[in-house]
Every structure is written in structure tokens, then in C-alpha cells.
From Swiss-Prot:
Keyword Hydrolase included in the entry's annotation: no
Primary role: Involved in the aerobic and anaerobic degradation of long-chain fatty acids via beta-oxidation cycle. Catalyzes the formation of 3-oxoacyl-CoA from enoyl-CoA via L-3-hydroxyacyl-CoA. It can also use D-3-hydroxyacyl-CoA and cis-3-enoyl-CoA as substrate.
Annotated keywords: Fatty acid metabolism, Isomerase, Lipid degradation, Lipid metabolism, Lyase, Multifunctional enzyme, NAD, Oxidoreductase
Taxonomy of the source species: Bacteria, Pseudomonadati, Pseudomonadota, Gammaproteobacteria, Enterobacterales
UniProt organism field: Salmonella typhimurium (strain LT2 / SGSC1412 / ATCC 700720)
Gene Ontology terms for molecular function: 3-hydroxybutyryl-CoA epimerase activity; delta(3)-delta(2)-enoyl-CoA isomerase activity; enoyl-CoA hydratase activity; long-chain-3-hydroxyacyl-CoA dehydrogenase activity; NAD+ binding
HAMAP family listed in its UniProt record: FadB
Protein name, entry field: Fatty acid oxidation complex subunit alpha
Length: 729
């Protein structure tokens, strides 16, 4: 053994070939600060071996290196810019030493090689991969850019266009595509990986392969003519501006850095990468996006822990076909859980099956599946008008009309047709689970399971624990949701649960703005372009359905009369009374027409102004800041109340529910991350300017306490240790 660290070791393999093996404790390898330091120490040993002829890098895990240790990011990003820059220089000196070894080097890459893992293998001369490879640089999705030389080496290896596509979009690619673009040199079966790697190294050692020529382009300026460079970078900047926009600075910074570094050799180019990385790491956007990643890991880990002793349901059923029922049936079948879809008439069943078939055909058109797979999946969705087969189902989700009487009747009837241990769930969006459970003999086997539309796209499923729901019931439904590829978040019961409970105060803020003379078009524009929502409130109401929102608004007002009961006729009432139900009938706040692809496209409709004039004061202009404050304060206050009341268990789960269920702008990180970023005291000062608008604008006492004591909602993060100690961590 030449060297042994905590996460890697170095040893002789054969005939002057050494192997450097990543083998961290636990299930995966990460390129954390300690591993970078250890890699440097291993290279120091290697540089003294005069009989060294070649080096093989490999992993003892199912994945090569899954990336940097993102749990370190928040503390690393808090160190002063100069100190972070020094550490990056140190890390890059390690990868440069790997690249500069006087012998051929090869990385045998299995499974994932992402972020720092990818940057590590870019420093070797050759890369051999297994068919399960996923390799790429996802850093821009975290609000940063590659910092270990990825933005320097990748363009010089692949050419500007392919590298820009991967780096700017934060993409990873599979083995076949990686081979096609030159990111790897060969693909072999797992059992042949080491044998193949040694064979390539031997060819390089004997001179049959020119490893020096392979290495040289990575050390030089990017080979692009002025015209080629202008075309590549202009197109890339245009695409990034269109897709990322102003709220996500990392992709544009990466493109501009690669452009600026193109005329330099490795050292100068790495310096430019460093100068671009460090300011990005100190942005609120980076902290928010890293926070989302960590929250996602936390939420998924919590679900995994909850279901560790539970068998995933093997047979499911959906009550109520239609678009929602068909979407749930498709998602379950697509992920391998057969499903019975029951309704009371053929028309609804046909609608549900058509929806499932449409979604499968989209997969076929995109080349994700073939006809055989499509037929196989659709055959596991069984439409029926009766309860045949319900004695075999493990879990049933009810997705009928949002009416408590109908839901109670359907659930009570179904309870008599299933096994005693079968779990029943309701896809209600607002009706308290306790109310629906009152119709059941076994309420302990019942809970809420709130999917979001469209089911196949929206990652969140709210799992609602009723007062009598058993732990096993919750665990079974969480297991099914996880199997469906969803992110389940368990919340406690109340009208609207978590997501809709906090959404309707936001809509109430919108209604009050319109009542006071705001133009809904400007409100939509400000909330989309300035705050960053994917849709403004008027557009969102049209998509949800004005009739649906009108009904839900009444349910919420009954549940929380002290805050959500209004004493005036609002825009939602006016549109509902005029049968302008939104996208579903082509008229809402906006008018909708189908485009060439059959998708609804919104247009202005002057007729709506006359309608809204009846419920509004004369038009007046509001500043962007005032619109954002009046829209967001009711939502933020209600989110805080939900945490204080135990409806949602943690800031992390609240923020992920908002991002995954409502599209809360990820660059803000969620409501609690947004609060922590600006500070509770600053938020309180802003909110107090609007408390005259009513109870929805009154800041909860818990938040006032946070402001008084300057306390964040997330645990404080300490800056990483000084760079000197990071080197030898």
C-alpha cells in the first residue's frame, strides 16, 4: 500500500501501473474538502515513484464520484472571498498535478461522475466508462459554476458548443452520448472495466497510443476562429438569456467566463474560472438553490426512514376517472404499480384511459419507450364500472368531485368492498380529512393524498394525516407516492392542508389589490418578471379554474373565518358569475386560444375590464415593491402560522412543498429561506406598513419574536475553517 486516506487509497496494480481507488465510508464517494486534500497527499507519494509507468483511477462503489459534498457548500460559501479563492487555487493545483503526471492516466468510470467527480476525470488522459454512466456538470443548477477546472477542460476536449450545452444547462449525459461527443474514449461492460482500462494504459505506455497528444489541447487556448467563437458564444448567451433569465446569474456567468478564457492556456483560464466562481458562491441565489438541494435530500430521507419497514403497495385503485384520475392511474402504472380505475359511467372511464394513453404516446414520440413498453404499461390500467378486483388492492385513492357528501358516500361504499387492511386515501384539495373520515368504520386506515395537476409533471404529493390516521396508513401511502416518483410531504389536517391554505391568502391579496384599483396585467407581470413566479396570480387562477377557486375560497373562508372571510364582492366572484371559468372554457382574466400545438395561449380581452370595474375602485398605479409586498405578506404569514400550529413539521418541508407544489421561485429557496435572506426584522417592518389591510396582513407572534431576537428559521451555518486547515482536512 503506497498511501491510505479515509476516502481513497493508492497501491501498485501491475507492471509499474498504480491504482488510485476512491473508497469512502458509506455507500457513495463524494469529492469533499477532505478527499481533495487526501488526493493531493496521494499524488505527493506518487510523484516520488521513479518506476511509475501509468495511473488508473477507479471507484470501489456503485458510482465513481457523485459530486462534491454539497452539505459543505453553505459553510464554504460563507468564508471571505479571498479565502475561498485560495482554497480553489489549492484544489486546482491538485487536479493540475494529476494532469501533469509524467505518465499516462486513465479514469475507469462507473455509474455517476457528476460535478467535482466529472472534473476529476477530466484531468486524466483517458476515460473508460460502463454503460450505466451519467456524467456531467450540474453546478449551474446550484447557482454556481464548475470550480475545479470543468469550464476550462471541457470546452478544450469537446469543443465550445457541446461543452456550453452541458455547463450552461447543468446537464449530465449517458454513456452513449458521452462517447459520441468525446467525453469518454470507450464504453465496456462493468466486468471488463478494469481489464479494458489496463489494456488502454499498456497501449499508452508502449507508445501505441499518444497520451501526450491527448493531453496537450487541455493545456492550450481553445482552438476556435474568431468567427466560430462569435457564433458559438453569441448563440449560447442568447439561449441562456431566454431560458435562465436575470434571476439565475450562474449560466450566463459560466458562458461569459468560458468565452473570456478561450484565448488563454490552462493557468490563466483557471484563474478566470476562480474569479467568476467566488462571487457566484456568495450570492443569495446560490445559497437558496443549495438549500433546495439539501432540503430535497432531507425530505426524501425522511420518507425513506418512514417507509423502511413497509412493503410498497403492489396493486392500487383510483376512484373517479377523468383527467386527474387518469393522470394518477398513468403515474402508478408507469412506475410499475398496476391500477384499477373505477367510475360510474363509460364516458368518464374513456376520458381517464384517453388521458393515460395520451401521456404514454408522448413518451413514445420522445423515444423514451417503444410500442411494446406502451402496450405493457396500458395493460396494467384496468378500467371498470364495478368493484371487481378491489378485494386484491393494497391502496385506493378517491378522486371524485370536490363535494364532501359525494366523497363520503363513495369512500363508505368502497370501504365495504376492500380488505380490512386496505388503505383508503382522498385526493381532496381542501376538505378536512377528519370530516371525510367520519363516514368510515376504519378511519385509522384513511388519510389524504393530495396530487397536483398535471399529475405527471408536479413532483409534490401532500400526505394528510387525519386525527385517527395510523402511522402504518401514512407509511403505506408515502411508500406508494415515492414509488410513483413523487416527493411526499406529510402534513397535519386542516382546511386546505398546507399548500392550498397558504395559496388562498395570496389570492386574497390579489383580490384586494384589484379592489383597490390595480391592473391585473401589471400584477401578473410584476409577480412573474420581478418576483419570479412561473405564472402571475390572474394567469394561475385561470389555470386552476375560476369555478374551482371560487368553491375553494368558500371552503377556506368557512375554515378560517377570522382571516379569510371577506366582506366584499371580488374579482373571482365577478368572473364566476359571468361564467368565465378560465382556460377550461377559454375565458377568464385572459382569453385563451389554441396554438398550432393545441396548447392554450393567453390573449388580452377588453371585455374583462368592464366586468372587473364593477368590483374595483378607479384604476391607479402601484409600484412593483408595493405589489410584491401586498401579494406575498398574506402567504408568508400563513406559512409561518402553519409551522407554529404544527400543520407542517419544518421550514425545510414547508419550502419544498411551496417549490414543488406551487412553483415558488427556486432562486428564493422557499418562504422561510426568503425570510432568512432578508431577515425577519426587515420583513416585519415591511409588513407593518400594510397591517391596516386586515387580519391576513397581521404578522404572527412567533415571527415577531424571531424579528426581536434576530433569529433565523434555518439553523445558523458556521463558515468553513481557514483555508490552511482545509488543505490538510
Amino acid at each position: 500500500m503506497l498511501y491510505k486516506g479515509d476516502t481513497l487509497y493508492l497501491d501498485w496494480l501491475e507492471d509499474g501501473i498504480a491504482e488510485l481507488v476512491f473508497d469512502a465510508p458509506g455507500s457513495v464517494n463524494k469529492l469533499d474538502t477532505a478527499t481533495v486534500a487526501s488526493l493531493g497527499q496521494a499524488l505527493e507519494v506518487l510523484e516520488k515513484q521513479h518506476d511509475l509507468k501509468g495511473l488508473l483511477l477507479r471507484s470501489n462503489k456503485a458510482a465513481f464520484i457523485v459530486g462534491a459534498d454539497i452539505t459543505e457548500f453553505l459553510s464554504l460559501f460563507l468564508v471571505p472571498e479571498e479565502q475561498l479563492s485560495q482554497w480553489l487555487h489549492f484544489a486546482n493545483s491538485v487536479f493540475n498535478r494529476l494532469e501533469d503526471l509524467p505518465v499516462p492516466t486513465l479514469a475507469a468510470v462507473n455509474g455517476y461522475a457528476l460535478g467535482g467527480g466529472c472534473e476529476c476525470v477530466l484531468a486524466t488522459d483517458y476515460r473508460l466508462a460502463t454503460p450505466d454512466l451519467r456524467i456531467g456538470l450540474p453546478e449551474t443548477k446550484l447557482g454556481i459554476m464548475p470550480g475545479f477546472g470543468g469550464s476550462v477542460r471541457l470546452p478544450r476536449m469537446l469543443g465550445a458548443d457541446s461543452a456550453l450545452e452541458i455547463i450552461a444547462a447543468g446537464k449530465d449525459v449517458g454513456a452513449e452520448h458521452a462517447l459520441k461527443i468525446g467525453l469518454v474514449d470507450g464504453v465496456v461492460k462493468q466486468e471488463k472495466l478494469i481489464e479494458g482500462a489496463i489494456a488502454v494504459l499498456r497501449q499508452a505506455i508502449t507508445g501505441d497510443l499518444d497520451w501526450r497528444a491527448k493531453r496537450q489541447p487541455k493545456l492550450e487556448p481553445l482552438k476556435l476562429s474568431k468567427i466560430e467563437a462569435a457564433m458559438s458564444f453569441t448563440i449560447a448567451k442568447g439561449m441562456v438569456a431566454q431560458t435562465a433569465g436575470k434571476h439565475y446569474p450562474a449560466p450566463m456567468t459560466a458562458v461569459k467566463t468560458i468565452e473570456a478564457a478561450a484565448r488563454f492556456g490552462r493557468e490563466e483560464a483557471l484563474n478566470l474560472e476562480n474569479k467568476s466562481f467566488v462571487p457566484l458562491a456568495h450570492t443569495n441565489e446560490a445559497r437558496a438553490l443549495v438549500g433546495i438541494f439539501l432540503n430535497d435530500q432531507y425530505v426524501k430521507g425522511k420518507a425513506k426512514k418512514l417507509t423502511k419497514d413497509i412493503e410498497t403497495p403492489k396493486q392500487a385503485a383510483v376512484l373517479g376517472a377523468g383527467i386527474m384520475g387518469g393522470g394518477i392511474a398513468y403515474q402508478s402504472a408507469w412506475k410499475g404499480v398496476p391500477v384499477i380505475m373505477k367510475d360510474i359511467n363509460d364516458k368518464s372511464l374513456n376520458l381517464g384511459m384517453t388521458e393515460a394513453a395520451k401521456l404514454l404516446n408522448k413518451q413514445l414520440e420522445r423515444g423514451k419507450i417503444d410500442g411494446l413498453k406502451l402496450a405493457g404499461v396500458i395493460s396494467t390500467i384496468h378500467p371498470t364500472l364495478d368493484y371487481a378486483g378491489f378485494d386484491r388492492v393494497d391502496v385506493v385513492v378517491e378522486a371524485v368531485v370536490e363535494n364532501p357528501k359525494v366523497k363520503k358516500a363513495v369512500l363508505a361504499e368502497t370501504e365495504q368492498k376492500v380488505r380490512p387492511e386496505t388503505v383508503l386515501a382522498s385526493n381532496t384539495s381542501t376538505i378536512p380529512i377528519g370530516e371525510l373520515a367520519s363516514a368510515l368504520e376504519r378511519p385509522e386506515n384513511f388519510c389524504g393524498m393530495h396530487f397536483f395537476n398535471p399529475v405527471h409533471r408536479m413532483p409534490l404529493v401532500e400526505i394528510i394525516r387525519g386525527e385517527k390516521s395510523s402511522d402504518e396508513t401514512i407509511a403505506k401511502v408515502v411508500a406508494w407516492a415515492s414509488k410513483m416518483g413523487k416527493t411526499p410531504i406529510v402534513v397535519n389536517d386542516c382546511p386546505g392542508f398546507f399548500v392550498n391554505r397558504v395559496l388562498f391568502p395570496y389570492f386574497a391579496g390579489f383580490s384586494q389589490l384589484l379592489r383597490d384599483g390595480a391592473d391585473f396585467r401589471k400584477v401578473d407581470k410584476v409577480m412573474e418578471k420581478q418576483f419570479g413566479w412561473p405564472m402571475g396570480p390572474a394567469y394561475l387562477l385561470d389555470v386552476v379554474g375560476i369555478d374551482t377557486a371560487h368553491h375553494a375560497q368558500a371552503v377556506m373562508a368557512a375554515g378560517f373565518p377570522q382571516r379569510m372571510q371577506k366582506d366584499y364582492r371580488d374579482a373571482i366572484d365577478a368572473l364566476f358569475d359571468a361564467s368565465r371559468f378560465g382556460q377550461k372554457n377559454g375565458l377568464g382574466f385572459w382569453r385563451y386560444k389554441e396554438d398550432s400545438k393545441g396548447k392554450p395561449k393567453k390573449e388580452e380581452d377588453a371585455a374583462v375590464d368592464d366586468l372587473l370595474a364593477s368590483v374595483s375602485q378607479p384604476k391607479r398605479d402601484f409600484s412593483d415593491d408595493e405589489i410584491i409586498a401586498r401579494m406575498m405578506i398574506p402567504m408568508i404569514n400563513e406559512v409561518v402560522r402553519c409551522l407554529e400550529e404544527g400543520i407542517i413539521a419544518s421550514p425545510a418541508e414547508a419550502d419544498m412543498a411551496l417549490v414543488y407544489g406551487l412553483g415558488f421561485p427556486p432562486f428564493h429557496g422557499g418562504a422561510f429561506r426568503w425570510l432568512d435572506t432578508q431577515g425577519s426584522a426587515k420583513y416585519l417592518d415591511m409588513a407593518q406598513q400594510y397591517q391596516h389591510l386586515g387580519p391576513l396582513y397581521e404578522v404572527p407572534e412567533g415571527l415577531r419574536n424571531k424579528a426581536r431576537h434576530n433569529e433565523p428559521y434555518y439553523p445558523p451555518v458556521e463558515p468553513a475553517r481557514p483555508v490552511g486547515s482545509l488543505k490538510t482536512a
